[in-house]
Structures are given as structure tokens and as C-alpha cells.
Amino acid sequence: MAQQEAEILRPLANFSPSLWGDQFIKNDSDAKVRYIFHYVDYTNLSMLTATGTKMVDTMNLIDTLERLGVSYHFEHEIEEILQQFFNLNTDYNDEAYDLYTVATHFRLFRQHGHRITCADIFGRWRDENGKFHEGLKDDAKGLLSLYEASYLRTRGETILDEALDFTTASLKSIAPNLESPLRRQVEHALVQQLHWGNPRIEARNFISLYEEYEDKDESLLRFAKLDYNLLQMMHKEELHEVSRWWKELDLVAKLPYARDRVVECFFWAMGVYHEPQYSRARVMLTKTIAMTSIIDDTYDAYGTIEELDIFTEAIERWNVEEMKRLPEYIKPFYKALLELYEQFEEELAKEGRSYATHYAIESLKELVRSYHVEAKWFIQGYLPPFEEYLKNALITCTYCYHTTTSLLGVESAVREDFEWLSKKPKMLVAGLLICRVIDDIATYEVEKDRGQIATGIESYMRDNGATKEEAITKFFEIANDAWKDINEECMRPSPHSRDVLMRILNLERIIDVTYKGNEDGYTQPEKVLKPHIIALFVDPIQI
């Protein structure tokens, strides 16, 4: 058997080991201790509802609460206030409203799904030729606010396309001459756009900026720090739970060809939802992502076509009896996968939601079928036309499956939501496009070095007679247009709750963070994800 195995030519990728070892399995005292915080009641919440408070002041407070990562405590109050303000139909052409105020209000309304138009309210900052006034370069706060607002644009909103180009160039030119904390905020925004960022990472960054504000609210700052640390302790305990589960499965030893990335998987899940009420959902999603990663590597970096034929059939039949036919190395994984979903079904049945596991399993079967197609392309040296490639690759990007499994632990997600996702709605397809093309850009060179020719970049280059640089430019255009579609689909009215829509949005934000700088931060987390993981799960904020 050993000799036969040695003769099998496998497409091994030689992935680097985990950066973390057993660090998060050791549930040290810091993670277990419940600090006896004198947990501050943030009394300035009264500002949100106080009679006579100016709309501008209330909107600025809402923006600060959201940036500090504590707005979830006041979610219902904020929604009610924004609806009331939106219903006022404020005339933003009034000279009383400066660029900073108008752009901030526009962004906040759009972030919460309100259909505020852009052409009417930003027009007064353009000249007779339709160009933004050069004098705006003296208004750094206004430029930054407009820059951030432009990322909430939808298709056809050319004024925001132009605003993004103008503010990006202007902020880059003036940033070196600004004073902190504004300079730091501008420099960070140019690297990581607020709307595309992981809310938890952005909160930690803004807390450090807010500390430098001359007009900061000291009680609010302390509240944000305490809240961050308390949530961090919860996240560390969850990470301990999934790390222990992963260790007990022992798949790292049994399947050494696969990536050992359970910590990074939890980072992804935390990016989808960080609030306390999603604790169960985070754990469930982490487990499904970790198992998917094993499947991905089995198809991409180990299995022979004969083995993958059998494994694909076994997933399709979803029966423990299929283990008898499977190659020995994959049997423990198959058994663990079935048992995981049995546990999910048993738990969700208690709340009348066992149907959710059916949708997740069917989505996984679809994913595995597409992995199988991709593996055959690789083994056969086949480069499909771009349209054929993309149809399959939108599934193998895994986000269709992960969007479905992200709702497993969300009690408010009902059958209609899962049915909606199963039909590949516009918002989901937009998310799949972002994931696919950004992943393709980041992994192109590595896959090329491994002899993989069936890549999106290669397919597009051949079909369009394009250079690599032209293909990459096109892929970024596809992603930008897809973001516009997501922004549109987040607008009200929607038959689906914000609770569901935000899962799709946050999954796309994880892509932007993970593949920042065209790096594959999941496969090689040292440069991109490691600093974030330390900030989120290791180092508390000093009070």
C-alpha cells in the first residue's frame, strides 16, 4: 500500500503550518476571568432622544457610536431616529449644511438602507463644467466624509464615481500636511475604506484615533474600551471552543496536506457577526468554514481524479455507508462532516429550524460538484472559456455555501431566507463575483507556479487577447460594479431583514480585508491577518 501511495502523483501545495499552534486551546486565566468592570451606563444615550437636540449633533453622535463599535447597544433607537430624520426630507442645499455634514448624513442614511439621492445634494460643490471645486482641497474633513460616502454608491451614480476619483487624489496629496489624528484617519481610510472594512477592526482603529480628539467624550471613550475588551473575552472563549474541537478531530495529523487555519476561520466568522447574540452562529460558521477548507484542499492539492469521483458521489449521497467506498485517508473527515451536521440538525430542531441544515447540505453538495469540475480541468490541463469558468467558479469561491451556513445559528433567519439564497438572488451573485475575482487576482501567481492553467485571469486573457494587467484591471471593475449592486440591494424596502442582508455584506468585507494588497491572507496569514488576529483576540485595549 505504501509503495502504491508513493507512486501516486499528487498536486501537493505544501501549505505552511498554523501560526498559532495550541495558543488558543490553552484557555488561560485572562480569557476565563470575568473582569469586575464597573460597566458604565452610557448616559449620553439621552442625547439620541433628547428634545431640542439638533439633528446635526444627533447624527454626529450616531456616527461616533458606530465607528467606536458600540452602536449595537442602541440599535433600535438609532433605527427609529434615522427613520424620523429621513422622513424630514431635509433640504441639504441649504448653505447651513457643509460638505462634511451632508456627506456624513448621506452615508449614514445609505448604511441603514434609506434611499437618499446623491445628484441633488452634492451638485453645489461642482462648477459649471461638472467638476468638483478645487477649493475643496482645503476642507480635509469634508473631503474625507465625501470619500467615505462615495463607497455607498450604486450603478449610474456618476457624481459619486467622480467624487471618489477627486477625493482619492486630493486626500493623497494633502495627507502628509495634515495634523493627527486627522492625518492618521485619512491615511488609514485610503488603505482600508470604511464601508468595505471589518467593523471590529475599524472599531479598534477608531478608538485609538478618538482618544486623540480634543472634543472627545471621555465617558463614551471609556465605555467603548470596556465594551471592546468584554467582547474580546467572549470571542476568546469561543475561539478556545472551536480550537479544542479542531484539536480533538485531529484532522491536521490525519490530513497533513490541508491548510490548518481554524483560527483564521474564526476570524472570518467574527467578521460576519461580532455582537454577543451571535455567539452560537460564530461557532457554527467557523466549523463549516474549517471543514470546507479541508474539502477545498482535497480537490485542489491532493486527491486523484478516481478518488475525487468517489468522494463527490459520497457527498451527494450523504450516507455513512458511503465510507466503505472512500479512500482510507478521507474516511475520518467524511464521518466528522456527517456528525457535525447531525449535531446542527439536532440543535436547530429544538427551535423548529432543522430545515436550515437541509439548505446548507444541498449548498455543500453544489460546492463539491463544482470543486470536482475544477479538479478535472486541472488534471486534464483544460482552460475553459471565461463564461464557462465563471459559472463554475462563482460556486467554488465558497461564498454561496458560507452565506447559507452563516444563517444556521441566526434564530431570526427563516425558511424564506434560505429559499431566497438557494435561488441565487442579485445580492448574492454580486457577493460571489467580488469573492471570485478578488481571490483570482490574489492567487494567480501561486496557482500559475503550481501549473494551474484553469484560472480566471488566464481564461479572460485568452478570450479577450488581454495582458495580465488588463485582466486584473477588468476584475477590479467587476468587483466595484458588484459592490454597487450590493449597495442597491441593501436599500429599503426589502422582503428580508437587515439581519440577513448584513451577513452577505459582512462576508464581502472579509474578502476585502483578507486579500488586501492582492495578498492571499488566508493561505499565508503572516503578513495580512496575523496583526488583526492579535489585535482582536490577544491584546486587550489599555483602559
UniProtKB/Swiss-Prot annotation:
Its cofactor is Mg(2+); Mn(2+). GO terms for cellular component: chloroplast. Mg(2+) 2 binds at D296, D300. GO terms for biological process: diterpenoid biosynthetic process; green leaf volatile biosynthetic process; sesquiterpene biosynthetic process. Barely detectable in leaves. GO terms for molecular function: beta-elemene synthase activity; germacrene-A synthase activity; lyase activity; magnesium ion binding; terpene synthase activity. It comes from Lavandula viridis. This is Germacrene A synthase. Mg(2+) 3 binds at D439, E447. It comes from the Eukaryota. Pathway: Secondary metabolite biosynthesis; terpenoid biosynthesis. Its main location: plastid. It is an enzyme of class 4 (lyase). It holds the Pfam family Terpene_synth. Binds 3 Mg(2+) or Mn(2+) ions per subunit. The keyword Chloroplast applies. CDD domains: Terpene_cyclase_plant_C1. Keywords: Chloroplast, Lyase, Magnesium, Metal-binding, Plastid. It catalyses: (2E,6E)-farnesyl diphosphate = germacrene A + diphosphate; (2E,6E)-farnesyl diphosphate = (1S,2S,4R)-beta-elemene + diphosphate. The keyword Ribonucleoprotein does not apply. Disulfide bonds: none annotated. Mg(2+) 1 binds at D296, D300. Its EC number is 4.2.3.-.
